[in-house]
């Protein structure tokens, strides 16, 4: 999606105030930033990385127009030399990132930016905005799809989304994560997301009787007729009239009622009663769709604890807003800085252990079991390190030399997870289609053990360090503490 707006000023103001200081000091020195997160939302075991396409769009189009410069000048905080510099700035650095749709884990770089310091600083907010939102919604969507156990999940959340972009991009990543489609028509036009939807209660209320409404809809869409049956009474009128329309019009004309939707009441009880009535009417092929404040926990309970007879789910606010865990805590931290022609590692230290960063320019390697094809761990190494798969591989806990795991030689393979997106400011990555991202994501998620994907107390996936990187980190901690 090419955004028609120039969003270059979508940045925290301090990006600009810092950049003027850099401009006055040494605007050409290079830095490396890692974009990563510290904690999975919903206390989950993984996330689904998303938002890269919008990062590419922003970085490709980074520039300040005359109106932008005039506005900044009006603030009386920036020199004319700096404003002149901004008026011609373009991104000239390197960006590496994990492909969209990949399952990812805390404390590993999702995006690595190497660029002149001002350029690297200016893109911070937009990168975090794109990735934080879309990764959050992709992850929530995947959890809901997982809970449905093969039953279709439809994204119905636009009216509860936080704004237009949240609805449009939320539908995009919901589809990447496995939803069957979306009710958001714009996302269908812009991205090719399958669009879904039939009727609202207002449609039924606009007719003299529920039967009249159903009949009119059936005659208009005889080969795609799904009826909303809870406007007045699901069991006393809705399902009765739906069956009657099927028998009076659809079946005599060679059509079948595709489905009925329930949007209120006890989903388990009503679905079982409706299923029985449909089956007794010879309509075993008619699907039952439910909606109304669903999430992965409700869906899991409906299927496993309550024995609901449901074929597909329409999910709205709990998906599009990730209602239970509405913030994805991605951060953007400097890990290396050029000095005298060399990249010097940098570290951020905190009294909170989880906020201590991993220094230096790093590679992210996914270690795979050669026999099963399943992921064993993700390993951070310094850029110059090479992994020899014919040798034992020792991976270390990010803070403790005594906590380690040895993976025997010749039992594993290694994948480099960070791929080049921009080189010297030029886009070198062919953006995959939405269908390609969706298929890739499904394949990659299949390499993650179910124990890591469970909802309650998931097994922690290892994101470990090489010995060389761990030693560097501990040395820097000792130096600065």
Which residues are covered by each model-predicted region?
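Gly/Ser/Thr/Ala-enriched C-terminal appendages of enzymes
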Residues: 1-29, 33, 42-44, 279-281, ...
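An N-terminal, globular interaction/scaffold subdomain
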Residues: 57-62, 97-100, 104
């Amino acid at each position: 999606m090419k955004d028609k707006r120039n969003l270059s000023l979508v940045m925290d103001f301090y990006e600009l105030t810092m950049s003027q200081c850099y401009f006055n000091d040494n605007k050409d020195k290079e830095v490396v930033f890692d974009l990563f997160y510290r904690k999975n939302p919903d206390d989950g075991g993984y996330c689904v990385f998303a938002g890269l396409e919008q990062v590419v769009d922003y970085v490709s189009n980074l520039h300040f127009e005359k109106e932008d410069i005039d506005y900044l000048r009006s603030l009386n905080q920036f020199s004319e030399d700096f404003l002149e510099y901004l008026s011609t700035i373009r991104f000239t650095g390197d960006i590496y990132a994990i492909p969209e749709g990949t399952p990812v884990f805390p404390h590993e770089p999702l995006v690595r930016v190497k660029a002149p310091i001002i350029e690297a600083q200016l893109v911070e907010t937009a990168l975090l905005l794109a990735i934080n939102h879309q990764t959050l919604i992709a992850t929530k969507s995947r959890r809901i799809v997982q809970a449905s156990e093969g039953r279709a999940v439809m994204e119905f959340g636009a009216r509860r989304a936080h704004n237009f972009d949240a609805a449009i991009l939320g539908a995009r990543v919901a589809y990447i994560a496995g939803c069957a489609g979306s009710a958001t028509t714009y996302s269908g036009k812009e991205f090719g997301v399958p669009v879904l939807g039939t009727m609202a209660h207002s449609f039924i209320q606009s007719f003299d009787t529920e039967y009249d409404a159903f009949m009119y809809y059936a005659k208009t869409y005889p080969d795609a007729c799904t009826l909303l049956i809870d406007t007045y009474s699901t069991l006393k009128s809705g399902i009765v009239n739906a069956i009657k329309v099927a028998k009076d019009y659809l079946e005599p004309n060679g059509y079948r009622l595709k489905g009925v939707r329930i949007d209120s009441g006890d989903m388990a009880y009503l679905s079982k009663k409706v299923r029985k009535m449909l089956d007794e009417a010879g309509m075993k092929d008619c699907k039952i769709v439910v909606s109304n404040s669903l999430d992965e926990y409700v869906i899991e309970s409906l299927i496993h604890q309550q024995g609901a007879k449901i074929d597909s789910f329409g999910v709205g606010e709990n998906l599009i807003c990730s209602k239970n865990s509405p913030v994805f805590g991605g951060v953007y931290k400097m890990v290396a800085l050029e000095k005298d022609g060399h990249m010097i590692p940098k570290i951020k230290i905190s009294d909170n252990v989880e906020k201590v960063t991993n220094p230096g320019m790093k590679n992210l390697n996914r270690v795979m079991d050669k026999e099963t094809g399943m992921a064993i761990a993700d390993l951070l190494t310094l850029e110059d390190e090479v992994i020899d798969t014919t040798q034992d591989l020792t991976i270390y806990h990010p803070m403790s030399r005594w906590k380690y795991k040895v993976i025997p030689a010749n039992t594993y393979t290694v994948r480099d997870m960070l791929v080049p997106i921009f080189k010297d400011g030029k886009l070198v990555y062919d953006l995959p289609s939405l269908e390609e991202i969706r298929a890739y994501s499904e394949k990659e998620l299949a390499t993650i053990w179910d124990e890591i994907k469970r909802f309650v107390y998931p097994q922690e996936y290892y994101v470990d360090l090489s010995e060389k990187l761990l030693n560097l980190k501990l040395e820097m901690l000792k130096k600065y503490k």
